[in-house]
Amino acid sequence: MAEEIEWWDFDAAEDLIDAVVGDVSFIIESALDARGQALVAFPGGSTPKPILEKLAQANIRWKSVTIIPTDDRLVPVDNALSNVAMIAKIFIPKGARVLPITSDAADYKLAGGAANARLADLHWPPDLVWLGMGTDGHTASIFPGPDMETALEGGKDVRAVGVAPDPLPPEAPVNRVTLTASAIGTARTAILVINGAEKREILEAAIEQGSKSAYPVGRVLDKIAVPVDIYCLDD
């Protein structure tokens, strides 16, 4: 399990946004001070979007920051479901380097291999991996399904794989590419942002179960060697 897990609870969305923006800004600035560059993995979706938009306003040397999605849907980059498109729209105007992890490969497993090769060219490990979680316990795009074990136990040198969630999520019924649990586990810092009592209950159970968890998020957290801050917006 993660070396240490600390919960931060918020009653108001604005307070959570401010806290995450402040902490992520500090992480990025610390990486820039230490190494002259920063590599971060951000999630897509509706929950992180307002946080990312506010983060982009921070006085950070964005030209020295490389951003990758923690996961993405296998759709064209101009599709509304594309995580990298959302991230790029927010951060490219600030000068950040935003790299897609998807490709034109028709087969999701080939797309995963292409993503893994692309990530091999980056200065690793990431300075930050920012995770979310669904009500099925998935994190990044490590979903319950036939590819879950590959994403969770695919080898220390495998940074990304293709996955076919089963069942496909109704809000985005497409295959995906995701960072693996081992890649997430190498991060210098890690945070997880959720909202609502239902997700909190699931996450607490997943953490308690650890490496034996039926929830992907529990097993991912088990592989993270650094402390993890969890930001939770209460109902």
Q: PLM features: what roles do these ranges have?
A:
Residues 1-40:
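N-terminal glycine-/serine-/threonine-rich phosphate-binding loop
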Residues 135-182:
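Class I SAM-dependent methyltransferase SAM-binding "motif I" and its flanking Rossmann-like core
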